[in-house]
């Protein structure tokens, strides 16, 4: 369980099929069940759409599910761009480097900055996996994943190429697709079974949201519905949730990491 200190309470996040420890041993006020396959009875529940790629399939079947244009760009990057794939074994050692890179990307696109507290807590629990596509000594794209059981979920994706010339933008676009592909290969070799694309937007009314969804669909994942469930674990947590609901009626919440990404 990932423990997160809030303003007045301690949250505990459990992902996918994870179960929290018994309340007497959890040490948290509120339990957040993330990406559950089924809703938790009597919980505050919201739905979240996502896409998932089956990593138990052979590599040729996985890449064969990519849309043709995506598959072409991955193969071109493999053959001509001189990219290097790096997976950071101890994510905590490179957390600031990743977050600084992401924040530069986020400022270009007017997105929320990286949630360093969340990232650091995930790293402490050994569930954070960082990866990077390099060309020479220059990082082109960074990804951050959350690992839970046999599933790995994309949490952040960042590439900084806005304002650059078109050839460089095309290179970074290929590198991003290539990095996703090599991330999947890495996780498959590590014995994971499912690559979750970190959510898709139900509302595609803006070009930005439609573009992110379209990018993820290029990889041919299967559409799934997740449930985000919130359960108080202490009287303090129950009171705080009631106050939080009143506050959110006036101020929209900060988005969960699932959708803090860009294509």
Locate the predicted segments by residue.
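Intrinsically disordered, low-complexity, positively biased terminal segments
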Residues: 1-39, 154, 158-160, 171-178, ...
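A conserved beta-strand-loop-helix scaffold within acyl/acetyltransferase catalytic domains
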Residues: 2-4, 34-46, 53, 58-168
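Active-site/acyl-donor-binding loops of N-acyltransferases
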Residues: 2-14, 37-61, 193-263
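Surface-exposed alpha-helical segments enriched in charged/polar residues
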Residues: 20-23, 75, 120, 181, ...
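A structural micro-motif
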Residues: 28, 81-83, 193
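Short, surface-exposed, polar/charged, turn-prone segments marking secondary-structure boundaries
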Residues: 78-82, 112-116, 161, 181-183, ...
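Aromatic (often tryptophan-rich) hydrophobic motifs at membrane interfaces
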Residues: 129-233
